């Protein structure tokens, strides 16, 4: 399904991210539940951590609070802004997704220690099992969304 298309289309275009990647991310993160809150306290459709969301909101001049972080418009804007910054940093979809899930700090360590390649050619070597599965699931769903 491609829910919230008005926001996905708007922010995909604004931040230069492929719409289908955003749909695949939302599906993996919250299964399109705007009120989703994880055990780690990540929030909304794109499961943003409060601190990450706060930093992104400042850059976009958004006044963020506990309510509007769950607003699909705000959440998709910040989540898309975040994945765009990771795609820009790593220049590789798989590696950017790993960073979205496990954090840039971990991904930078994995690359510098040779655990994974910066070009994403060996994502099956991602040391965190959850992140490993996460990246492969999103890449699979991303391909499916491209066919729809």
Q: What does each model-found stretch correspond to?
A:
Residues 1-148:
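Catalytic glycan-binding domains that act on GlcNAc-containing polysaccharides
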